[in-house]
Each structure stands twice: as C-alpha cells, then as structure tokens.
C-alpha cells in the first residue's frame, strides 16, 4: 500500500469513527422516560419547576377543584401526583401532550396548556415525564405501565 492510500484510509477511518461517536451521542438523548435515572430526574425537576409548576403546582398538586370547568369552560391544570389522572396516560401520550398541547391531540378540546415544542427539547420533555413518574409510588407506576401498554 502506498503512503497516499494509507493516508486516505486513515482519514476515512477517522471520519467513520467520528460519525459513529456522533451517532452515539445522538442516541444518548432519552427517547422514553426513566424515573430511576437520578440525573434525568434532576434535569426534569429543574425544567418542571421552571416551565410547569406555575400551573401544575410546585408539588405536582395541580390547581384547586381541577375536575370542574373554569368560568371560561376550560379545565384547570390537573395534578401530576398520584391523586390525578396523569398516570392513566401512556408515556407517549404524556410526551405528545407536553410537546403539542392537549388541544392539538383531542379535536375540539380547548386547553390553557400550550405545547412546549418551541420551548423544550424532546430530551427535556422526557426528563419532565421521568421526574413526574419518579414521584409516583411503585404501585401507581406498575398500574400506569399495565394500563397503557399496547
């Protein structure tokens, strides 16, 4: 092999390795919640406190009387703790509702909750879902998984 061919092979090898590292980094972003991942949960808690707590409560308690419509006809922000119905939804539904807002998913449903697609990355949304799920007791987590599996 000539020196020029060796050099070209080395360059191609470096490019391939670099591309592989880049793909590995891209895959490191969460594509599902992981309520047992302390780092992801901490990230989710920080994002929740900044973006969600003003409506859903700093303790995930939701707004008072959340089961009854507001004067504008819309529903108050529900709790995300075990007393609410968040755990009745699949992980994908929780992600989608956060990303595009409930109104975009349910035809005719009006909600004060906006979608966060322009404010949060997908990884941030999964981190928030991870944080919320991390606060649920094991029996609620298990019920959510059983209820929402296809």
Language model: regions and residue ranges:
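Bacterial N-terminal signal peptides that target proteins for export
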Residues: 2-12
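The canonical Cys-X-X-Cys-His
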Residues: 44, 48-58, 113, 128-132
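Gly/Gly-Pro-rich "capping" loops immediately C-terminal to redox-active cysteine motifs
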Residues: 45, 61-95, 115-120
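Axial heme c-ligation environment in periplasmic c-type cytochrome domains
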Residues: 68, 78-79, 97-126, 135, ...
